[in-house]
Regions:
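Extracellular/periplasmic periplasmic-binding protein-like sensory domains
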Residues: 142-194
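Short low-complexity, flexible loop/linker segments enriched in glycine and/or proline
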Residues: 21-23, 44-47, 116-117, 171
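Ligand-binding clamshell of periplasmic/extracellular solute-binding protein-like
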Residues: 6-17, 32-39, 129-137, 156-164
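Residue-level signal for pocket-adjacent positions within structured domains
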Residues: 34, 43-46, 99, 177, ...
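Hydrophobic/aromatic residues located in beta-strands of well-ordered beta-sheets
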Residues: 29, 74, 99, 153-155
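Extracytoplasmic "Venus flytrap"/periplasmic binding protein-like
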Residues: 1-8, 12-31, 41-43, 122, ...
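Generic beta-sheet signal
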Residues: 30-32, 51, 157, 179
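Extracellular/periplasmic Venus flytrap/periplasmic-binding protein
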Residues: 1, 37-38, 46-146, 185-192
Length: 194
């Protein structure tokens, strides 16, 4: 969408698609959200500025958290697009052991019956998800509704457990762990001052 004579793009898949054209034309791309790992590595470009985060950072922190909590059998689940792939790779980098299983879903998927059946059969002690927005809302409701939260601890990034998701899901969010950089109700001096 045009904003004061500029174009605004969002999403890792979009950043990777339009980036080369913009870079070839020596046009700066300022990303307020997407930070595909490719643009921080092999495809790093002086015309790309990520003002938020690199995609895999939150997920790497979650992997480290899962290691510290000593989860022994962890399954991971994310949509099959660049940010989802970065999520799983970041988690695996932070987690000290190999993951039990990796599942990539369709981007925008809302029905997780097949994935829940697979999880029930695998019986992991923890599940890491990257399912932002409606995907996360539906998955968490279905996960808890299927009774899987009684035996499997769910862990996710802030994108899968932000205020909007919590508001939409409600009580089934209780007990979920998430990694995020900030929330308005963090009880520490820096957050309260902000």
């Amino acid at each position: 969408a045009p904003v004061q004579g500029r174009m605004v793009f969002d999403g890792s898949n979009v950043a990777l698609a339009v980036g080369p054209t913009l870079f070839a034309a020596e046009v700066f791309y300022l990303s307020n959200n997407a930070g595909p790992s490719q643009l921080a590595g092999a495809q790093c470009n002086p015309y790309f500025f990520g003002t938020a985060w690199q995609n895999d950072d939150y997920h790497e922190a979650a992997g480290k958290f899962a290691s510290e909590r000593n989860f022994r059998k962890v399954a991971v689940l994310a949509p099959n697009y660049p940010a989802g792939q970065d999520a799983i790779n970041g988690f695996k980098r932070g987690y000290a052991k190999p993951v039990a299983s990796e599942t990539f879903t369709k981007l925008g998927q809302l029905d997780y019956a097949a994935e829940l059946a697979k999880l029930r059969a695998e019986a992991p002690d923890a599940l890491y998800i990257f399912l932002p927005g409606g995907m996360g809302i539906n998955f968490i409701k279905q996960f808890v509704g299927a009774g899987l939260s009684k035996s499997t601890q769910i862990v996710g990034p802030g994108f899968s457990a932000d205020e909007d998701v919590i508001r939409a899901v409600g009580e089934p969010m209780l007990g979920m762990f998430n990694t995020a950089h900030w929330n308005h109700d963090f009880a520490n001096a820096a957050s309260q001052a902000f």
